[in-house]
A protein has these predicted regions:
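Hydrophobic alpha-helical transmembrane segments of multi-pass integral membrane proteins
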Residues: 70-519
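Short secondary-structure boundary/hinge segments and terminal tails
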Residues: 44-45, 66-68, 150, 289, ...
Length: 612
């Protein structure tokens, strides 16, 4: 047995890659591809095997074989656009939360609270907030996560990463334009159509990238159909978006607006929240929870019920509700109500299937788990509220308040935020808090625990849901509700900052590696993006080459320590009008002696004098 065969399931990825650089190629084959930086995330091999669905014995055998490879055979670490594609999407999601999304929602809520009326806030503002949350916050996180994780889970690479990326600027532009269209309504239909078209193109790009990635992978898995269904709901929501804008923003009269809202608001939001977000979350849970936390895999029968039950109830619910409301046939609405029981059954049964609240081994636990557990508790609360809605309306709301309309806006809004903030947002916060440090090469178990975010988000949402229902009976509850949004925003700001810091750490790691790009011999590689100072630190003798090409400032030790640290070879060439290819060739071809890395380059005194 040689030394290489000491690679075991307990070994941490970075330690292994550091000792046996050739093993990274094997991890790449199973979907590592730049995740966690050049040496992979700080996780054990057993965890990697489970997450990437590779039999551990096979993985260990291949790793041990590759470990004995000659250092010169080791491929260079060259991260590509697809390797960190989640980053700009997640950043856009965080930015949305802190501006048009939750921040705007909190301002709306404060206005409602202070004026003690749900109609006190401009409805266009509510619509703009809701749209930014669904297409922006939920959309960006779903896109970023899917682009990053889907190809890796399937041991392939992302189909056309540059095209995939364009979904981001398109979606940002579409959402911003749509926000303006809401603010300018009713004179903004054309702007809305333009905004909706751009967003639809973005969704089509996203959906086709995922479908084509799956096709090239040829590795069908149980959760795939959830992803496809969520993509289908996303497309439907994108196509329906301008229609809904017209119905809600451009209704001819108040009666028409009330009819449109009563008939189409619930179905449209169901397509968005249940169709896009909940279906995708259920699919991601299926892939992530058993593989990342070692939880039990739901039975085949439950997986089937989960898929057909949820998608069936959304579809039937949407059709029956629209038909019932527009025809006045109450039987259709009763059947629609029955579909909500399926959602409640899913919410109760799914965490049981995973044994989500059972013991999880110490080494599998991390900061994301508490959010994921809380999310499933909120899912049960939200679906129980949904089932209870007609009972509340007829048996509690109407008799106590004397209302003639069997619909409490307060109760339904409370249900909606139990689902959106409690389940959808909590889940996104939990999963992102787990994957971002992992992908950035930060040890998730040593990272910030995010307890303040967890407590504030739950406290804020609990206050919001309970006080919003209480506004039906006690006007004083409005003021409590009014401030609850800011509790959530503070929690989310802490979370956003933490993720941002994790991503920055990952970026730094990559920069360092791209600067210290090494091949199997541990040798430094010079590329157009390499900083001038790094070249000189590694190969002080190359100073002469720079000077020959007219880079005067590098002769000055102070400028070498300052300016040269931030200027890349490419930038320096542009600045000095030097041919990049020629310089690179010369730098790379110079016979490099093994000079100590830290030695100061020696500049002839006369040369310094002439340059300065
Ligand atoms: C800090 C978090 C949030 C705050 C303070 C907030 C605030 C509000 C307010 C004040 C309303 C209007 C009142 C009402 O109808 O009940 C509203 C509506 C809405 N919000 Fe939020 N929200 C938050 C998070 C979210 C999230 C995470 C989502 C989606 C994932 C979301 C989606 C919606 C939707 C769909 C509506 C209904 C719009 C309609 O009437 O059609 N919100 N939100």
């Amino acid at each position: 047995m040689n030394e290489a065969e000491k690679i075991t399931a307990e070994m941490f990825l970075p330690e292994m890659v550091q000792r046996y650089p050739a093993t990274r190629a094997v991890l790449d084959l199973y979907g590592l591809h730049g995740c966690g930086g050049p040496q992979g995330p700080r996780e054990q091999l057993g965890w990697f095997a489970r997450l990437h669905d590779v039999p551990i014995e096979k993985l260990l055998r291949e790793l041990n074989e590759s470990a004995s490879q000659a250092p010169s055979d080791v491929p260079e670490f060259a991260p590509s656009i697809g390797d960190t594609i989640y980053r700009p999407f997640f950043l856009a999601g965080i930015a949305t939360v802190l501006t048009l999304g939750c921040m705007w929602g909190a301002i709306n809520l404060l206005t409602i609270g202070l004026k003690q009326s749900f109609t006190a806030v401009n409805y266009s503002w509510v619509l703009a907030h809701a749209h930014a949350m669904v297409f922006g916050f939920v959309g960006f996180f779903i896109m970023g996560f899917a682009y990053q994780a889907f190809p890796r889970f399937k041991h392939t690479s992302l189909w056309r990463p540059k095209l995939a990326f364009t979904a981001l600027p398109l979606m940002i532009a579409g959402i911003l334009l749509q926000t303006v269209a809401h603010l300018l309504s009713p004179s903004s239909l054309q702007l809305e159509i333009a905004a909706a078209t751009i967003q639809t193109i973005s969704v089509i790009i996203f959906a086709s990238t995922i479908v084509m990635t799956a096709r090239q992978a040829k590795k069908p898995e149980v959760y795939d159909r959830f992803v496809y269904a969520a993509l289908g709901w996303f497309l439907l929501a994108a196509v329906g978006n301008p229609v809904v804008f017209k119905l809600f923003e451009l209704a001819g009269s108040r009666e028409q607006l009330l009819f449109n809202l009563a008939t189409f608001n619930i179905p449209y939001r169901d397509v968005q929240l249940l169709g896009i977000a909940v279906v995708m979350i259920l699919g991601v849970s299926l892939r992530l929870l058993p593989h990342a936390y070692g939880l039990r895999e739901p039975s085949r029968a439950w997986q089937g019920f989960l898929f057909w039950g949820v998608n069936g109830s959304i579809l039937a619910g949407v059709v029956l509700f629209i038909a019932g409301m527009s025809s006045g046939n109450h039987w259709l609405l009763i059947v629609q109500w029955l579909t909500t029981f399926v959602l409640l059954a899913v919410a109760i049964g799914t965490p049981r299937q995973y044994r989500l609240f059972g013991p999880v081994p110490e080494n599998e636990r991390d900061r994301g788990l508490k959010f994921i557990r809380a999310a499933y508790v909120w899912f049960i609360i939200a679906t129980a509220m949904l089932v209870f809605t007609p009972i509340y309306n007829f048996a509690i709301y109407m008799p106590i308040t004397g209302s003639h309309v069997p619909f409490s806006h307060a109760f339904f809004g409370a249900y909606r935020h139990a689902l959106t903030v409690g389940f959808i947002m909590m889940m996104i916060v939990g999963v992102s808090s787990k994957v971002v440090p992992t992908l950035s090469g930060v040890d998730v178990r040593r990272a910030n625990s995010l307890w303040p975010t967890f407590l504030l988000l739950n406290l804020g949402n609990l206050t919001r849901v309970s006080s919003q229902i209480a506004t039906d009976f006690f006007p004083s509850a409005y003021s409590v509700m009014g401030f609850s949004g800011f509790i959530e925003v503070v929690g989310l700001t802490l979370w956003g900052y933490e993720l941002f810091a994790n991503m920055r750490a990952g970026k730094k790691l990559e920069r360092e590696t791209s600067v210290h790009e090494q091949n199997g011999n541990g040798r430094f590689r010079i590329t157009p993006q390499t900083k001038v100072a790094d070249v000189l630190t590694h190969y002080p003798q190359l100073l002469q080459v720079f000077l020959r090409h007219g880079f005067g400032p590098v002769a000055n030790p102070v400028l070498r320590k300052t300016m040269a640290r931030v200027v890349t070879i490419e930038q320096a060439c542009r600045r000095e009008g030097v041919d990049l290819t020629e310089l690179l060739a010369e730098l790379q071809n110079v016979e490099i002696s093994d000079q100590p890395a830290n030695s100061e380059p020696v500049v002839p005194i006369t040369r310094i004098a002439t340059i300065q």
